[in-house]
Amino acid sequence: MTEEFTPPPLPPPFTSNKTPPVLLAQGAEARLYKTDFLNPSFPAALKFRPSKPYRHPILDRRLTRQRVLQEARCLVKLLKEGIPVPGVLSVDWNTGQGEDETGNGGAWLLMEWIEGPAVRQVVNHWEKWMKHCESATKGNNSGMNENFERSAEEDIRSLLRRIGRVIGALHKAGVIHGDLTTSNLILRGQSNENTTNIDPHSTTLKPNLEGEIVLIDFGLASQSVQDEDRAVDLYVLERAFGSSHPRTEIFFDEVLKAYRESFKGASSVLETLKKVRMRGRKRSMVG
């Protein structure tokens, strides 16, 4: 008989909310909630970093404070530069004055809730839809209509170019994301009927690839203008496409082309990316 799941404790002041925050994700360092603490019609994202009982209390407070403030500072800086990221609503880096986890110690960051599907979900849907369309025309002498195929591929290319531009703006502002994956890119401002509310196994509906690219989850972010750091950011995203989106990977150059056009220092970053790739390949060969 399995034990009933007990939700982890929340930090104050969220413990007094009539409608408790909904736990969306739990990682090694933080928990992500959706909450209407401020206003029922104004949802927000709550990122809570609980204290670690296995760490020395002074070290724990220092590390937790450093990480939550680093994330908040990066977000505020990017917002000032006009880069689409969640707005910072509130931050507390000394919750419970460093008590252990049962006392809800740690730190939290309250952010704007970004409505929309993750790019990972949308691209997966596009790949399944393309496969379905190809199967539907299999056996036809003309195969898939060339104009249709070009149009569908241009849609995904356009999405990748938008991703490249927003990453270029991110790096131009001197911020490194640290965890660039398609799960940390959100498409905001589009109708979700063909994305978030569909059967994930459905392949008959054409996916909606429109919307503004919003960067989320800056838990590993840092401020840097080094080509190496920027190149590693791009390499992480490139590997994410290779592992999660094999059909779309062949269009990844669209990301890099748009990135190159986004700021003057992009060319040297892309040269460094070639070296990072070589190191990555050697590491894979060695194991």
Curated annotation (Swiss-Prot):
<dbReference type="GO" id="GO:0005829">
    <property type="term" value="C:cytosol"/>
</dbReference>
<keyword id="KW-0547">Nucleotide-binding</keyword>
<dbReference type="GO" id="GO:0016787">
    <property type="term" value="F:hydrolase activity"/>
</dbReference>
<keyword id="KW-0808">Transferase</keyword>
<dbReference type="InterPro" id="IPR008266">
    <property type="entry name" value="Tyr_kinase_AS"/>
</dbReference>
<keyword id="KW-0597">Phosphoprotein</keyword>
<keyword id="KW-0067">ATP-binding</keyword>
<dbReference type="Pfam" id="PF06293">
    <property type="entry name" value="Kdo"/>
</dbReference>
<dbReference type="GO" id="GO:0070525">
    <property type="term" value="P:tRNA threonylcarbamoyladenosine metabolic process"/>
</dbReference>
<feature type="binding site">
    <location>
        <begin position="24"/>
        <end position="32"/>
    </location>
    <ligand>
        <name>ATP</name>
    </ligand>
</feature>
<comment type="similarity">
    <text>Belongs to the protein kinase superfamily. BUD32 family.</text>
</comment>
<dbReference type="GO" id="GO:0005524">
    <property type="term" value="F:ATP binding"/>
</dbReference>
<feature type="active site" description="Proton acceptor">
    <location>
        <position position="179"/>
    </location>
</feature>
<dbReference type="GO" id="GO:0008033">
    <property type="term" value="P:tRNA processing"/>
</dbReference>
<keyword id="KW-0418">Kinase</keyword>
<dbReference type="GO" id="GO:0000408">
    <property type="term" value="C:EKC/KEOPS complex"/>
</dbReference>
<feature type="domain" description="Protein kinase">
    <location>
        <begin position="18"/>
        <end position="287"/>
    </location>
</feature>
<dbReference type="GO" id="GO:0106310">
    <property type="term" value="F:protein serine kinase activity"/>
</dbReference>
<keyword id="KW-0010">Activator</keyword>
<dbReference type="GO" id="GO:0000781">
    <property type="term" value="C:chromosome, telomeric region"/>
</dbReference>
<keyword id="KW-0819">tRNA processing</keyword>
<dbReference type="GO" id="GO:0005634">
    <property type="term" value="C:nucleus"/>
</dbReference>
<keyword id="KW-0779">Telomere</keyword>
<keyword id="KW-0158">Chromosome</keyword>
<keyword id="KW-0963">Cytoplasm</keyword>
<keyword id="KW-0539">Nucleus</keyword>
<keyword id="KW-0378">Hydrolase</keyword>
<comment type="subunit">
    <text>Component of the EKC/KEOPS complex composed of at least BUD32, CGI121, GON7, KAE1 and PCC1; the whole complex dimerizes.</text>
</comment>
<dbReference type="GO" id="GO:0004674">
    <property type="term" value="F:protein serine/threonine kinase activity"/>
</dbReference>
<protein>
    <recommendedName>
        <fullName>EKC/KEOPS complex subunit BUD32</fullName>
        <ecNumber>3.6.-.-</ecNumber>
        <ecNumber>2.7.11.1</ecNumber>
    </recommendedName>
</protein>
<feature type="binding site">
    <location>
        <position position="47"/>
    </location>
    <ligand>
        <name>ATP</name>
    </ligand>
</feature>
<dbReference type="InterPro" id="IPR011009">
    <property type="entry name" value="Kinase-like_dom_sf"/>
</dbReference>
<keyword id="KW-0804">Transcription</keyword>
<comment type="function">
    <text>Component of the EKC/KEOPS complex that is required for the formation of a threonylcarbamoyl group on adenosine at position 37 (t(6)A37) in tRNAs that read codons beginning with adenine. The complex is probably involved in the transfer of the threonylcarbamoyl moiety of threonylcarbamoyl-AMP (TC-AMP) to the N6 group of A37. BUD32 has ATPase activity in the context of the EKC/KEOPS complex and likely plays a supporting role to the catalytic subunit KAE1. The EKC/KEOPS complex also promotes both telomere uncapping and telomere elongation.</text>
</comment>
<keyword id="KW-0805">Transcription regulation</keyword>
<dbReference type="InterPro" id="IPR000719">
    <property type="entry name" value="Prot_kinase_dom"/>
</dbReference>
<feature type="compositionally biased region" description="Pro residues">
    <location>
        <begin position="1"/>
        <end position="14"/>
    </location>
</feature>
<feature type="region of interest" description="Disordered">
    <location>
        <begin position="1"/>
        <end position="20"/>
    </location>
</feature>
<keyword id="KW-0723">Serine/threonine-protein kinase</keyword>
